[in-house]
Amino acid sequence: MTNERAAPASRPAVTDVDLFSAQLGRLRFVHLRRRDVVAQAVSWAKSLQTHFWHPGEAVAPGGEDPHYDEELIGRLVATIERSEADWTVWFAAHSIVPCEVTYEELAADPPRTAQEVLDYLGLDVPPDRQLVVRHRRQADQLNADWITRFKSH
């Protein structure tokens, strides 16, 4: 006598997109990424070291003065690249074509980029409102130096 059981009846897989759609209705996806992953990794490394995440802040409690750490930057580049690859696979697996926005486009022309995203989402800014840009770049000469140094290896 064997100890076999009948396999459970297969049910259609419920995806995370299905779950989100059930709760939120029609979904539209905006994929924000940075073309220059080394610059992104450098900014991330500095923030990890200083605990400074927003313009106008100083080194936060527990933070330290930034110092070049090639190993950390390399690990962060790899993390960013894996994450971007994972998003590419996830979007493709769900037949999703997101609105692609790069940090570089957003930083160069925030109002235009925001309007493109709103258009993609089918949203209008109410007539009595306007888009206000509050973004300030945190990158400085130290970022530029670290980027150059990392890319030269």
Question: Predicted regions: what is each one?
Answer:
Residues 1-98, 111-126:
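PAPS-dependent sulfotransferase catalytic domain
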Residues 59-74, 105, 125-153:
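PAPS-dependent sulfotransferase catalytic core
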Residues 104-111:
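An alpha-helix initiation/capping motif
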